[in-house]
Amino acid sequence: MDSHPYAWIEAALETVKRAHWYRSVQTIEGRPGAEVELAGQRVLNFASNDYLGLAGDQRLIRAAIQATEQLGTGSTGSRLLTGHRELHRQLERAIAQLKQTEDALVFSSGYLANLGTIAALVGPRDLILSDQYNHSSLKKGASLSGAKVLDYPHLDMGGLAELLQTHRSNYRRCLILTDTVFSMEGDVCPLPQLLAITTAHNAMVLVDEAHATGVLGATGAGAVEHWGCTDQTLIQVGTLSKALGSLGGYVAGTAVLIDFLRNRCPGWIYTTALSPADTAAALAAIAVVQSEPQRRIQLHENVQGVQAQLQNLPQLQEPRGRFRLLPSQSAILAVQMPDPATALEVGNALKQAGIFAPVIRPPTVPTSRLRLSLMATHTPDHCQRLGVAITTALARSLS
């Protein structure tokens, strides 16, 4: 036995490095946008979740400054003690209006919203069925709940139905967990099919709208609106930190669900309330989402333009080639790579060409990939330069 109780950490880190899984932070200087300063280099930003370009919007900045001047920098306590402000309820009402639900509840982060909500809804006598590619917060929330957790194959509604048929009757409650837009693939859950299956088996459904809110749907309400399912009873969780350009998370649903979570959700009860600045910025962002649909239109035009470029690349047209463009109906485009080393090589080549596009490697994803995030503020020239840089990087890797 090793004499030092922490000695294993260094060995574990070396294993990570040998597998090409090692990660480190990259410093962005200045305000976020379609172009940013990355470690002193001016680059095109295809790495951000700021899909509508609102994180640097002057209206959000002014709202945050005004709230800070009026209410201070911190909320100073939990919502049930000293942390509640009328601004929080204004944001919750705005989220409920956007999501077309009866009420909403704001959390300090989207990750915390998932952990806390899942733990409040199910326990050791219950069953969770989870898409195998769900976000870490859904997976971790399921694990911590104490419920029996079974994964179903990615987007496989037949597989989900089979698990329900086999296992549902053995448990008190059943909760289905799924992202609506999958963050590392860009594909979208077939929500009408899922709801039809789960309704037949008396199962609750929790959807994570993190990458759909502000992006999908006629008014930007997300994938639930996109699929025409706003009249269905389900639990919608999301974040304020992506298309809405702020920080925090939310749960939207029925009034009784939200009232229950205020009383039974540890991730909301026992944590400090969202800061006034973040709350005000998110509230301003929702107003922009509802009043400026052209941002979503431009975003989807950018996505379609880049998709068309990538689909025409010879390196991505071979059925069994080393590189593959994954199917996507969102602002996220992923190019699958054969291995972590190749992914790093392509990512470095893009960075040298002035393109910031992250490579995602195991264990975050099952296979290495280049993950591209499009923004409404990308110009046609930005998208064209991205296509040229990817063409060159893939050709260099093949040679």
From Swiss-Prot:
It catalyses: 6-carboxyhexanoyl-[ACP] + L-alanine + H(+) = (8S)-8-amino-7-oxononanoate + holo-[ACP] + CO2. The keyword Transferase applies. Pathway: Cofactor biosynthesis; biotin biosynthesis. PROSITE patterns: AA_TRANSFER_CLASS_2. Keywords: Biotin biosynthesis, Pyridoxal phosphate, Transferase. It is an enzyme of class 2 (transferase). Signal peptide: none annotated. The modification N6-(pyridoxal phosphate)lysine is found at K242. GO terms for biological process: biotin biosynthetic process. GO terms for molecular function: 8-amino-7-oxononanoate synthase activity; pyridoxal phosphate binding. Substrate binds at R23, H135, T364. Pyridoxal 5'-phosphate binds at G110, Y111, S183, D208, E209, A210, H211, T239, L240, S241, K242. Coiled coil: none annotated. Homodimer. Belongs to the class-II pyridoxal-phosphate-dependent aminotransferase family. BioF subfamily. This is Putative 8-amino-7-oxononanoate synthase. It comes from Cyanothece sp. (strain PCC 7425 / ATCC 29141). The lineage of its organism: Bacteria, Bacillati, Cyanobacteriota, Cyanophyceae, Gomontiellales.
